[in-house]
Swiss-Prot record:
Chain positions found as 4-hydroxyproline: P57
Propeptide feature ranges: 24-54
Entry domain remark: The cysteine framework is C-C.
Region (Disordered): 23-46
Gene Ontology CC terms, in alphabetical order: extracellular region
Protein's name according to its UniProt entry: Contryphan-Am
Pfam families per the UniProt record, alphabetical: Conotoxin
Keywords of the record: Amidation, Bromination, Calcium channel impairing toxin, D-amino acid, Disulfide bond, Hydroxylation, Ion channel impairing toxin, Neurotoxin, Secreted, Signal, Toxin, Voltage-gated calcium channel impairing toxin
Length: 63
């Protein structure tokens, strides 16, 4: 009877780890998170941001 109990506990542990690995990856902290827009001005704003950080080669581009 003791071996059966251990076998059932091991099987339950293996199944629970399989469920965690195959889950959708939703973390409790991320569930209510609001998606953040890192580039509110779109692709052109992202390009200008890169130019500003890298040192703009041509002044009219950098504004």
């Amino acid at each position: 009877m003791g071996k059966l109990t251990i076998l059932v506990l091991v099987a339950a542990a293996l199944l629970s780890t399989q469920v965690m690995v195959q889950g959708d990856g939703d973390q409790p902290a991320d569930r209510d998170a609001v998606p953040r827009d890192d580039n509110p001005s779109g692709m052109s704003g992202k390009f200008m941001n890169v130019l500003r950080r890298a040192g703009c080669p041509w002044d009219p581009w950098c504004g």
